[in-house]
Amino acid sequence: MSEGSEDTKTKLDSAGELSDVDNENCSSSGSGGGSSSGDTKRTCVDCGTIRTPLWRGGPAGPKSLCNACGIKSRKKRQAALGMRSEEKKKNRKSNCNNDLNLDHRNAKKYKINIVDDGKIDIDDDPKICNNKRSSSSSSNKGVSKFLDLGFKVPVMKRSAVEKKRLWRKLGEEERAAVLLMALSCSSVYA
């Protein structure tokens, strides 16, 4: 009985040092060593663990590393290749902002007149716009300037009753689209 217990101790001690094939824990056919194919035990090549929720591929082959060692191995490999996720993120952010950077001094200016009957008159003469810019802000009632785009847009304010009436007319898909657009424009915080 002491021989059997010594045998299992040596197998347990050597589990972290040797691979599954050396420990005879793997069986390619159902008759190898009296163990079924469901009893195969994997050990991590780096740390020797046998319990992990996810096995990852490593230098020793597929599913040879535990989750933690697989992540470490991937990070080391990426660092060796010169691929850093931080640099990628910075590049992505800078590329996104380059599209919206406009030179406001060279942007074409438009003058928008709102006529009483609801029509909008657009004048693209820059001299008129520059003269009107020096006037007081009270003349710009109902017009909002979008600085990022360099032009003026009329702002129409609706009463609460009109908003509710319009909201009722919209279907479920249209309401969802309006809410998504509001979230993407950062006008509503979730």
UniProtKB/Swiss-Prot annotation:
Q: Where are the zinc fingers (GATA-type)?
A: 38-92
Keyword NADP on entry: no
Q: What is its main location?
A: nucleus
Pfam families, alphabetically?
Answer: GATA
Q: Mind listing the UniProt keywords for this protein, alphabetically?
A: DNA-binding, Metal-binding, Nucleus, Transcription, Transcription regulation, Zinc, Zinc-finger
Q: Segment Disordered: which positions?
A: 1-42, 77-101
Q: Name one GO cellular component term.
A: nucleus
Q: Which domain of life is it from?
A: Eukaryota
InterPro entries documented for this protein: Znf_GATA, Znf_NHR/GATA
- SMART domains reported in the protein's UniProt record: ZnF_GATA
Q: Subcellular localization, per the record?
A: Nucleus
Instruction: Drop me one GO molecular function for this one.
Output: transcription cis-regulatory region binding
Q: Where is the composition biased (Basic and acidic residues)?
A: 1-14
Query: What is known about what this protein does?
Result: Transcriptional regulator that specifically binds 5'-GATA-3' or 5'-GAT-3' motifs within gene promoters.
User: Family assignment?
Assistant: Belongs to the type IV zinc-finger family. Class B subfamily.
Name recorded for this polypeptide: GATA transcription factor 17
